[in-house]
Curated annotation (Swiss-Prot):
InterPro entries attached to this UniProt entry: RNase_H (IPR050092), RNaseH-like_sf (IPR012337), RNaseH_domain (IPR002156), RNaseH_sf (IPR036397), RNaseHI (IPR022892)
Binding site for Mg(2+) 1: 9, 52, 74
Residue runs in coiled coils: none
Protein name in the entry: Ribonuclease H
GO cellular component: cytoplasm
UniProtKB keywords: Cytoplasm, Endonuclease, Hydrolase, Magnesium, Metal-binding, Nuclease
A GO term for molecular function: nucleic acid binding
Role played: Endonuclease that specifically degrades the RNA of RNA-DNA hybrids.
Domain RNase H type-1: 1-146
PANTHER family documented for this protein: RIBONUCLEASE H1 (PTHR10642:SF26)
Amino acid sequence: MPDLVAYTDGACSGNPGPGGWGALMRAKDGDTILKERELKGGEADTTNNRMELLAAISALEALDRPSTLTIITDSAYVKNGITGWMHGWKRNGWKTSTRKPVKNVDLWQRLDEAQSRHTVTWEWIKGHAGHEGNEKADELARAGMAPFKTGKRGKDG
């Protein structure tokens, strides 16, 4: 069975501001890439953290059957949230340890639901450090943001 890996990244021009997300999905056998799929999208008014979350959500939601995969992100927010903080948030009714509402709760709940169908290993890597998969995810995120940046809209937007 091939290994499934998703590199995810978010980008934002201003925070908040126009943003994009990207995910590079790869099925691999050792070092051989068997299949690759690129996903991207964006929003006109968002934050970097929301785009990071949407990248991971989109990767998971793109899978049409329960899968085992590794999600590689340069977002400590996503990695720490999904592997550590979320358990407490859920126990506290989606409130932080200081009893404040969890920011981006809509996306955290969506990520929780999307992850529940799969067996996921989460890995954090340093962003903009020359890691090929992460650099491609960053490129996709910036491409997803491009239509929402001022002066970059097409004639239909």
